[in-house]
Amino acid sequence: MPRRLDASERASFDQIPTTDLERARLVCVPVLTPGIAGMTLDRWMLLRRGHEHDRDLIAHELVHVRQWRELGVVRFLARYLGAYARGRWHGLGHRAAYEAIPLEAEARVVSGR
């Protein structure tokens, strides 16, 4: 069942714009791709069961909520998938190509993850 972040959670993420804290919906899911603890699609933060209280992961996914809002669906996906594809094209393995995506790098810096 999707849920909003509660007031204490919102207060703890002062680096995230209020608009995105209010828009975000956290969904605990039983399964994601192996090795993935969280994934964001627009305002929907999908967190693997057992990670729904991981503050650093939530902060990371909240950065993606902001990115989706600022860029919109088409631009976000074009930048994200384009960067991943370029990394793979240039011979990077999956993990290295993922880590080289600028949107992921920004989320890691802001969240400390």
Per-region residue spans from a language model:
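Short pre-active-site segment immediately N-terminal to the catalytic Zn-binding motif
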Residues: 37-58, 69, 97-100
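Active-site-flanking alpha-helical
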Residues: 63-71
